[in-house]
């Protein structure tokens, strides 16, 4: 087994965060009283609204800014955001679905081997930091892709990035480095 051979790695997207604007002022009290699956947080000036399909939680501010979390793909995030905008229109607001943007993607990938973290950190010092007293994973940053990887000794890698493409590219880039530091199978 060598690092150049094509290995099929499953990248499981666990969370997609997106933002959009409604281009109108939203009355949070009206949303709280008339909306479905709503929690009104008056002390912080926001409303939480949950959708069942797709399973999304939205944070709504009176300015019209809405953040949606919980989707498992970029398409699902957009469908959920549009569905949320439609439910606000049904409450009587003049909502226009604008400035939609995926801001964060969280994914998990499991390598088919375990990783020696101390050795990996020494070989990749400027990009990797490992503090075993504080956290059991190596934090590896790829500035060009704006991604952060948490690499665990079990071979599990958690990737945070701006979009799905950069997350997949980060996994492709990191594979040869973690392959060099893999634990020998007895």
UniProtKB/Swiss-Prot annotation:
One of the record's GO cellular component terms: cytoplasm
PANTHER family: TATA-BOX BINDING PROTEIN
One Gene Ontology term of the molecular function aspect: DNA binding
Parts forming coiled coils: none
Organism of this sequence: Xenopus tropicalis
InterPro entries, per database record: TBP, TBP-like, TBP_dom_sf
Protein name per Swiss-Prot or TrEMBL: TATA box-binding protein-like 1
Disulfide bonds: none
UniProt record similarity statement: Belongs to the TBP family.
Reported function: Part of a specialized transcription system that mediates the transcription of most ribosomal proteins through the 5'-TCT-3' motif which is a core promoter element at these genes. Seems to also mediate the transcription of NF1. Does not bind the TATA box. Members of the TBP family are differentially required to regulate transcription and development during early embryogenesis. Particularly regulates genes that have a role in catabolism.
Superkingdom of source: Eukaryota
Location relative to the cell: Cytoplasm; Nucleus
Single GO biological process annotation from the record: transcription by RNA polymerase II
Name of the coding gene: tbpl1
The entry's keywords: Cytoplasm, Developmental protein, DNA-binding, Nucleus, Transcription, Transcription regulation
């Amino acid at each position: 087994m060598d690092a150049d051979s094509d290995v099929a790695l499953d990248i499981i997207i666990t969370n997609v965060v997106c933002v959009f604007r409604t281009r109108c002022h939203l009355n949070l009290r009206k949303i709280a009283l008339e909306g479905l699956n709503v929690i009104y947080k008056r002390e912080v000036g926001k409303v939480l609204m949950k959708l069942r399909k797709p399973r999304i939680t939205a944070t709504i501010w009176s300015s019209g800014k809405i953040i949606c979390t919980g989707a498992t793909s970029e398409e699902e995030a957009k469908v959920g955001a549009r569905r949320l905008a439609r439910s606000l229109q049904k409450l009587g607001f003049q909502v226009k679905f604008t400035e939609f943007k995926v801001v964060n993607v969280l994914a998990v990938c499991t390598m088919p081997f375990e990783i020696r973290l101390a050795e990996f950190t020494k070989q990749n010092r400027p990009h990797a930091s490992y503090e075993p007293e504080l956290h059991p994973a190596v934090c590896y940053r790829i500035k060009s892709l704006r991604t952060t990887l948490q690499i665990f000794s079990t071979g599990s890698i958690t990737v945070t990035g701006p979009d799905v493409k950069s997350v997949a590219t980060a996994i492709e880039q990191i594979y040869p480095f973690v392959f060099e530091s893999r634990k020998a199978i007895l």
